[in-house]
Amino acid sequence: MYNVIGVRFKKAGKIYYFDPNGFHIEHDSCVIVETVRGVEYGQVVIANKQVDEHDVVLPLRKVIRVADDRDLLIVEENKQEALSAFDICQKKVIEHGLDMKLVDVEFTFDRNKVIFYFTADGRVDFRELVKDLASIFKTRIELRQIGVRDEAKMLGGIGPCGRMLCCSTFLGDFEPVSIKMAKDQNLSLNPTKISGLCGRLMCCLKYENDEYETAKEQLPDIGEMITTANGPAKVVGLNILERVLQVELINREKVIEYTWEELLEEGVVSAQTTD
């Protein structure tokens, strides 16, 4: 077992484990840690706890110290420098005629590196741009190409539901989302209805998917023939979460709604699925 704390470096960012280095660190505290990018400032979202070896990536990097007001001042200064760096880089991108969109700029806490995040449809030769930026900022330069989902996460915005984007408020990682999830939930497959601001399938399609899959295993499919107290019927509609079925009575050409529980009480029997 390892004693660790969980640290985030960005809102809704991924959580990384660190060795607390003898410190007892409370939730919501801020710390200075050594990372692969250099010295960084992060927020503790998981206080000291014991985790299994399989849940950590070894070797664990250590906390340098608990952050104080002076460290927070440096963070704010870095944010202001990043705004200026964004404008400078934007002008250089135009000067070099590069087909890329600058999304964000970030200084590491110790200012040993400046990271420029961008999107582009293809590969971009930015070697000359890097040289220009290095001569201006006198530090290490990294240009990192990101995808459209990461862009939406960084910039934030309002989703089709009218709420702030999930990815920019609480989702630490992107999980795979498939068109099958929309089909299983009987949603419209119109891309404008099931796509987020990033143009990809909405992350929220994943949230209730397990419940839909479990419920669908218990309910008959649309098109399936069943026997009801009113005679044989064909399932023509299905509200999975409310467990309500619309069935068309074969002998009466009439559509009736039943809850699945009502059908079970009537001794419903599934027959064969029809085309």
Swiss-Prot record:
Coiled coil feature spans: none
Subcellular location: Cytoplasm
Keyword check for Cytoplasm: yes
Lineage of origin: Bacteria, Bacillati, Bacillota, Bacilli, Bacillales
Role this protein plays: Essential for the phosphorelay during initiation of sporulation. May control the level of phosphorylated spo0A through spo0E activity during sporulation.
Signal peptide positions on this chain: none
Protein's name in the database: Stage 0 sporulation protein YaaT
Entry's Gene Ontology molecular function annotations: mRNA binding
Superkingdom, taxonomy of origin: Bacteria
A Pfam family this chain is assigned to: PSP1
Keyword DNA-binding: no
